[in-house]
Amino acid sequence: MKKIIVFFSVFFLITAIITGKKCREVIQKIDTISTENTTNILIKEATTEDKKKTGIKQLQKVRIVIMSNNYTSIYHSSLTLKGDNLKVYYGKNFAKQKGCKKVSLDGDSSYFKNSDVVKIYGKTGITIQGHNTENGSPVYMGELYLYREQSGMVVVNQVDMENYIAAVISSEIGEESPLEALKSQAVCARNFIMKSKALEYEKYKANADDSTDFQVYNRIKPGKNSKKAAEEIRRCEELLCVHPVLGTL
C-alpha cells in the first residue's frame, strides 16, 4: 500500500510540473526583464485577503474611475456616450431601462430624477465622445456607472480583469513590445490592481483611476498582442490555483 501511495504521489507531482512548466517560465523571466519597464512594481504572488481552499482568490472584475481629459479632474460636467444597442439603467434600484445608440447626460438629466446613479451597458463597448486619447476616443468594455455629484458626474468603468489588463499593457508599454515583456507587464498589472486600495474612491467601490497615480488604462487601444499576454497570464494563474505546489517548485 505504501508503494502505491508513493507511486501516485510521484505521478501527480510530475504531471503538475509538466503542465505548469510554461507558467513557471513566464514568472521566472520576470527577474530578467529590463528595468525600463514603466510599471516599477515588485513581482509577487497575486493574492487577496480572502483566501480559501487554494489560498488564492481571483478578482473577476475591477472598477476604475475615468478621469477627464489630461487627468485634471474626476468630474465630468456633461457626457455623450455611443455604442451599439446601449442599455441605460436608471431610477431606484435601476428599475427602468432604455435601449439606444447614443445618450447624452449632465447633472440635470431626467435619468437622475429618482437616483443619483445611472448604469450603462454596451455589449460591444461604450465610447465617450470627445474623450480623446493617443488614438481617438477609447472604447470601454463592461459597464459605466455615472454618479451625480455637486461638482459633476463621476464615471466608473466596471470591467472584466482580462480586458482591464490588456488595456493597461497597451497604454503602459505599447503593443509592439516582445510578448514576454507584455506577459511580465500583465503580471505587474494584475498584482498591482489586486492589492490596490484606493481609499479616495471608496465611495464608488473603485480599485483605482486611469491615471499614472495608479496604472494608465485604455489610453491606447489594446491589440491582439496585449490581449494574448493578458489571457496567457490568466491561464497561468488559474493553473497555479489548481496546483499551488507549483509556486514553490
Give the location of each predicted region.
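Conserved, single-site charged/polar hotspot
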Residues: 2-249
